[in-house]
Amino acid sequence: MAPSHAVRCCQRGLSWIPVIFINLVVCWSYYAYVVELCIYTIPNVNEQVIYLVVFHAFFFMFMWSYWKTISSKPTNPSKEFCLPKAEKELYEKEERPEAQQDILKRVARELPIYTFTGSGAIRYCDRCQLIKPDRCHHCSTCDKCVLKMDHHCPWVNNCVGFSNYKFFVLFLAYSMLYCVYIAATVLQYFIKFWTNQLPDTHAKFHVLFLFFVAAMFFISILSLFSYHLWLVGKNRTTIEAFRAPVFRNGPDKNGFTLGFRKNITQVFGDQKKYWCLPIFSSLGDGYTFPTRLVTVDVEHGNIEHQTIKCTVDGQTNARPLSESQNHLLCNDEGQKDSSMAAIEVCQPVCVTLENES
């Protein structure tokens, strides 16, 4: 027990090395730009002031978003998703996978669970001993289940998920702007030092190296930022991009796609004034998520992904799943309610549900 605890402590200590490295590079870049470039190299005072004001604006936003990404604790599933004591004992005693799934299905009927494993089973974490909410995954590094997990990032030593994904995207954006601003403003002095138009001073090394480092980081961050912008536009996580979520009717990589504008608001919120600020404004609670509409066949309980129209008295309406009293795991009860609704209006009714995961 003691050796494993010691190893765990060493791993936690070593996991901060990338964060320390990034902070050392940022501290050096701050010194090189403010002191060696602006104070010792740039002769014009007005140019110094303009460079410093804009630089500190980017630096502040970059550090703010970086700190929020690091410090935001990943949200974990609530006790509601843990098995009750009686069911847990039955589950642990049962050796047959089919019987274990029956136990999980009974518990999952009361939970907003709409995604499954590749084999159609309830997603259960044996490590955390809970039923995984939709889009929730277990992080082997943090040893916890994380809501809407995207990935574990060593550069922030934290899991990127529902609680801090917006901060992570902003961190990439502002770090990219920070690098491109430094490279653009340093370029003319880089050329002057390189061509010996300026005398050799202690600032020469800092200015030359600062340009190379800023350009290198900009190029590497640009590809990662572009990829995550694409993910935001598709309303996918990195995990979902590699492994499509499985709904009742099978895998669907576009299961959570709502349209470009709505996809963006899922991450950044519906108030644009907060989009550029590392302030939490993402929509939802991390447990349930709106998805494309699905049709429930009243007669057979079949579910099909498509654009749904619910026609009652000639009117077309769409009803979100959160407003429905039926879970996808409770087909019998849902079919009864839907059938009664069809009888009352004296015509076929297509019940519309918005799948949440």
Swiss-Prot record:
PROSITE patterns: DHHC. This is Palmitoyltransferase ZDHHC20-A. Its EC number is 2.3.1.225, 2.3.1.-. InterPro entries: Palmitoyltrfase_DHHC (IPR001594), PFA4/ZDH16/20/ERF2-like (IPR039859). The active site is at 153 (s-palmitoyl cysteine intermediate). The gene is zdhhc20a. GO terms for cellular component: endoplasmic reticulum; endoplasmic reticulum membrane; endoplasmic reticulum-Golgi intermediate compartment membrane; Golgi apparatus; Golgi membrane; perinuclear region of cytoplasm; plasma membrane. Pfam families: DHHC. GO terms for molecular function: metal ion binding; protein-cysteine S-myristoyltransferase activity; protein-cysteine S-palmitoyltransferase activity; protein-cysteine S-stearoyltransferase activity. The keyword Transferase applies. It catalyses: L-cysteinyl-[protein] + hexadecanoyl-CoA = S-hexadecanoyl-L-cysteinyl-[protein] + CoA; L-cysteinyl-[protein] + tetradecanoyl-CoA = S-tetradecanoyl-L-cysteinyl-[protein] + CoA; L-cysteinyl-[protein] + octadecanoyl-CoA = S-octadecanoyl-L-cysteinyl-[protein] + CoA. Residues 1-14, 72-166, 229-357 are cytoplasmic. Keywords: Acyltransferase, Cell membrane, Cytoplasm, Endoplasmic reticulum, Golgi apparatus, Lipoprotein, Membrane, Metal-binding, Palmitate, Phosphoprotein, Transferase, Transmembrane, Transmembrane helix, Zinc. Residues 36-50, 188-204 are lumenal. It is a multi-pass membrane protein. Residues 123-173 form the DHHC domain. The chain crosses the membrane at residues 15-35, 51-71, 167-187, 205-228. Palmitoyltransferase that could catalyze the addition of palmitate onto various protein substrates. Catalyzes palmitoylation of Cys residues on protein substrates and has a preference for acyl-CoA with C16 fatty acid chains but may also utilize acyl-CoA with C14 and C18 fatty acid chains. Disulfide bonds: none annotated. PANTHER family: PALMITOYLTRANSFERASE ZDHHC16. One of its GO terms (biological process) is protein targeting to membrane. The DHHC domain is required for palmitoyltransferase activity. Belongs to the DHHC palmitoyltransferase family. It is found in: Golgi apparatus membrane; Cell membrane; Cytoplasm, Perinuclear region; Endoplasmic reticulum membrane. It comes from Danio rerio. It is an enzyme of class 2 (transferase).
